[in-house]
Amino acid sequence: MIEAVTEAVKAAARHMVREGFRIQEKGSAENIVTSSDLAVQEYLTGRLKAILPDSGFLCEEEGLSDLSHPYVWIIDPIDGTANYARGDENCCISVALAKDGILQLGVVYSPWRNELYTAEKGKGARCNGEVIRVSDRSFGQGLLFTAMSTYRKEFARCCSDIIYDLHMECNDFRRLGSAAVELCRMAAGKAELYFEMRLMPWDHAAAGLILREAGGCLCGLDGNDPSITEPALVAAANSPENLDRILRTIRRHLTELPY
């Protein structure tokens, strides 16, 4: 099935046109959707329903949510829409498949980076067909991917305090503007640490599976798997030891989710 899903995702990327797309706000100037997001999502839902007829969908755009089936596709048609709208290459299509709430496969395609990440549960992770693994760098050597919870700016102070403490202990930090791109680059050994206050399931489902299959780990504030049906804090690392250190830092500032 992974081959059919990969082909569908690559074909959907043709709808990520560089010119002529329309932009509209979704409640705030920071949260936008483009006509390309909608076109990619419409194409993918049709193709994926044909691959697995008895399946539901949880998608970012237009409130598409049907969790009544054993199989559910979790789709972000363009993760990093703000980047996409500005012509920045850090954006991607993200598709995951869950069965009875357990992630089975993930495909993340970043066409302008020419990076196609794939994973199936228990079968490892690949980028452009080549096996990938997380790095073995220590926390002090680690590069942190993070963000300031752009759509909920009331969390910015707490985020900045956590990021400051992590930054003081690791090598450096980056913000690419796409959780899926960041988690996949971690899977490929390009960074070691990750923290984001609030992600939606479609932001992390596919890339989270890819990271795990590459030897990494991720969790929510409680240390369990991040929810794939509700918003979640997501922490991730290249090793359980580094993940535990991230969680201990977060919990110095945050004992429960503020949403």
What is the meaning of each model-derived region?
Residues 1-7, 161-167, 183-259:
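Oxyanion/phosphate-interacting regions
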Residues 1-78, 259:
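N-terminal subdomain of lithium-sensitive/metallo-dependent phosphomonoesterases centered on the IMPase/IPPase/PAP
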Residues 50, 58, 67-133, 209-212, ...:
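Active-site-adjacent structural elements in enzyme catalytic cores
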Residues 37, 60, 76-79, 83, ...:
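Acidic active-site catalytic centers that drive phospho-/nucleotidyl reactions
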